[in-house]
């Protein structure tokens, strides 16, 4: 009887220890990044504008990133004009009018110049006009970096000073505060992150990707 009681106590103690370890150990679950960025379509690209995700999404075709026309006007430059009747994308500067046939890689100016940029400048997807980010960038002051797995892009229209911290040891960036929160990405010793917000014992950061 004594042996049985001891065995039961050992089993109970071991089980309690397992519960404690599980309760106070970090989660190893990885976040679903498609869900995190709200990506519902295979070629959708989440737009991180400054430090916040925009409600709009870019698209990627043939390795080229495109903004829909409304997004171009809203965030970058409202001087682009869509001529649906002629199927043209038009941009006007003080010195010239730049035209491109939608679906073409060639632009032409009112000064008689032409250039093949090497990618489709603008295209329709259904009734929505999309314009290549690199083409928009010719006439708007912004920078962007495109990342894969899943597709998302960092866009800056302002370049202010940021508070930066260096990672002192390999660790994980988690979706929310708490040891049970899912892992978003890994950071290595020596990596730099941007400090967005400090709340009690947690820090909201942005990694380079």
Per-region residue spans from a language model:
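Primary recognition of N-terminal secretory signal peptides and signal-anchoring hydrophobic helices
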Residues: 2-199
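Noncatalytic linker/hinge segments flanking ATPase motor cores
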Residues: 190, 205-206
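Short aromatic-glycine-enriched beta-strand elements
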Residues: 200-204
């Amino acid at each position: 009887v004594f042996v049985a009681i001891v065995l039961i106590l050992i089993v109970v103690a071991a089980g309690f220890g397992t519960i404690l370890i599980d309760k106070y150990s970090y989660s190893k679950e990885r976040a679903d990044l498609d869900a995190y960025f709200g990506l519902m379509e295979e070629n959708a690209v989440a737009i991180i504008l400054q430090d916040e995700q925009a409600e709009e999404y870019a698209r990627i075709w043939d390795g080229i990133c495109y903004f829909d026309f409304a997004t171009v006007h809203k965030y970058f430059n409202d001087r682009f004009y869509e001529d649906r009747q002629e199927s043209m994308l038009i941009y006007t500067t003080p010195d010239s009018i730049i035209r491109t046939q939608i679906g073409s890689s060639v632009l032409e100016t009112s000064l008689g110049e032409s250039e093949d940029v090497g990618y489709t400048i603008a295209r329709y997807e259904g009734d929505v006009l999309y314009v290549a980010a690199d083409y928009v960038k010719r006439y708007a002051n912004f920078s962007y970096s495109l990342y894969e797995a899943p597709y998302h892009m960092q866009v800056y229209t302002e370049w202010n000073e940021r508070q930066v911290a260096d990672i002192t040891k390999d660790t994980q960036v988690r979706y929310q505060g708490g040891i049970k929160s899912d892992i978003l990405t890994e950071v290595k010793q020596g990596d730099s992150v941007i400090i967005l917000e400090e709340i009690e014992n947690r820090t909201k950061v942005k990694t380079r990707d």
